[in-house]
Amino acid sequence: MSSRMRVYSATDVGKKREINQDYVFTSDIPVGHLPNLFVVADGMGGHNAGEYASSHGVMTLVEEITGDVEYNPVKVIRHAVEKANTWIFGKASQEESYSGMGTTMVVATIIGGFLYVANIGDSRLYVIDREIRQVTRDHSLVQEMVRLGEINADEARSHPKKNIITRALGAEKTVDVDFFDLKLTEESVVLMCSDGLSNMVEDRKIEEIVHRDDISLEEKGRELVREANNNGGKDNIAIILIEPFSSEVD
């Protein structure tokens, strides 16, 4: 199936930040016992600490998955996420310059038409087929406020506390990971992104761009980044677009 899979990924510093703390990893060939692997991470911390947390967190995750003898995708990803959490937390605890650093992380693999997803923080995974669906649930203060009925989804988008997350990799000694799985269709497109995209571009606009049939997957990805920057580019932007069952011919 990987031979039919099309992938586009990008990060962009945005319009307001000097350092890019977002990090992406993509592989449409096996990583350990997983047939493919896709990761988006959005780091946080002063100076270069956020950049360090996201990049080294992802590298630790990939290293662990590469060496894991387990075949169950959920167990493989859980082991690797826990190892990455331990590594970031340890580094932040031992070195003052890295104190308080952490990262969001959304991890995905596609096996036999099924999508397996792990999530910590407010980076997102969407599936777009007939309509757009957010698969992950944000671990954020405003999402909790929405859940409790204190604000609605539109108010959450512009809320002054929208950047406060309630869960992050490396923030504590142990990490609670959410897992999701679903069956993909021939029409499914998977979008993974940091909040630099989802806070800047509304879901319906994302859906509109992904549904365009006059441009390539790469052009759709570039258009999403462009749209985020045109709307203010207030944060770093990271995206991965995946067509698991592409019927295009080179």
PLM regions: where:
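PP2C/PPM-type serine/threonine phosphatase catalytic domain
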Residues: 1-250
